[in-house]
Amino acid sequence: AYVFAASMNAPVVFVCVNNQWAISEPTTVQSPTSLFRRATGFGIPAVQVDGNDVIAMMAVLRSALEYARSGKGPVFVEAWTYRMGAHTTTDDPTRYRTAEEESTWGKTDPIVRLRTYLQNRGIINQVWLDGLAEREDAFGAEVRAAVHENATPVMADLMADVYAEPTPDVLADAEEIASWEEDK
């Protein structure tokens, strides 16, 4: 994608959310160079930004979008952040990360940082936050109710729109799924 975007001077903004982990290995094991530096090898301007700072992200992305939209070509933005949870449901990050590391990064939670920023400037207050929590709860209840109202989809139907014309493999898979559903 880099080569194509650079060659075509495409108005693309690549955003890489670097959570510093490649499953259970730090990304520094895979590459000693920061990811954003790779883009410059393709002639693409690149920047690394604190991905946990909403204001910084907004400023960098606005600038990157303006650059790309003005016809100057692609831009690469690396949002430097941290994966707080496990990689998968079978992953145990305590095998390769310390509680101290997680605690340190937990203090940079972007939601908490933005809330603090807005409160310190008098833009929002606790009354506003309480109202937001009520709206969130109501929205969540609405979404859960809508999900429960929908019928369970027929699994074989999920393959109907994979291709304009189903391939023999897709048809065979759909038949197998339909047979499996009948046997349940």
Where are these regions (language model features)?
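C-terminal intrinsically disordered, low-complexity extensions immediately downstream
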Residues: 142, 148-184
